[in-house]
Regions:
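P-loop NTP-binding site
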Residues: 1-233
């Protein structure tokens, strides 16, 4: 959240900048808008929202209060400090209690989807881009246009959408922190997982991870003569 408020980039293998290990309420106050947007998005589905504040030993009481207030102001049903790393299960008791309460008070009829499957592929992508990411629109490459047309003609137009984009920003630009405005989602191609039953647009500069290596580990899993599973590790 401090990074979303303008904090320095975090680089793998390097110590965290001081603002992340020392109290900095100014950066945090600026960055909680990102959390509030996530809460707003979750509430679109009609579900209870519980925010887990994962406590680090460097977090201060003032910072924890800022996060909790921002979450509640945005409509979260609760925002609970969780200190399970230091205290084990007991440290997560408050969070667990809040989750149980939310489940008990949740009505199944309240749940709703963001879009109807019957919408066109482009309409579903636009719905996600505008309502979840806050984009002004969507730009489709020529390749994406051709792929969408082919999927629609092949009977895959009603499949749900799983967006593949950077996790560091609501936009396709990983450096655009907070809740960016005035941007468009760029779809450079659209791939299909017909067996699993969804389409996934590739947005901006993002690489996908293969689901299995060239030689998957299941080749080594077997049963020995006593019926024990071997080869898992």
């Amino acid at each position: 959240l401090k990074m979303h408020g303008g904090g320095a980039p975090v680089k793998a293998g390097q110590p965290l900048p001081l603002e992340y290990v020392q109290e900095n309420t100014e950066l945090l106050t600026k960055g909680v808008c990102n959390l509030q947007k996530h809460i707003e998005n979750a509430r679109k589905f009609g579900v209870k929202v519980i925010v887990a504040i994962n406590k680090f030993h460097t977090d201060t009481e003032a910072e924890i209060c800022i996060v909790r207030k921002a979450a509640l102001d945005a409509g979260a049903d609760d925002a609970c400090l969780s200190n399970h790393w230091a205290e084990g299960g007991e440290g997560a008791r408050l969070l667990a209690t809040a989750v149980v309460k939310a489940c008990e008070n949740q009505k199944a009829d309240d749940f709703k989807l963001l879009y109807e499957d019957a919408l066109s592929i482009k309409e579903k992508i636009a719905k996600i881009s505008l309502e979840i990411y806050g984009a002004d629109g969507v730009v489709f490459s020529d390749l994406a246009e051709r792929q969408i047309d082919q999927y629609s003609k092949s009977g895959f137009g009603s499949l749900p959408i799983c967006m593949a984009k950077t996790q560091y920003s609501f936009s396709c630009d990983a450096s655009a922190k907070g809740v960016p405005k005035g941007f468009k989602i760029t779809v450079r191609e659209v791939r299909s997982c017909a067996g699993a039953g969804f389409l996934y647009p590739i947005c901006g500069e993002i690489m996908t991870i293969p689901g299995l290596p060239t030689r998957p580990g299941f080749f080594d899993v077997d049963l020995d003569e006593a019926g024990n599973v071997v080869g898992l590790f």
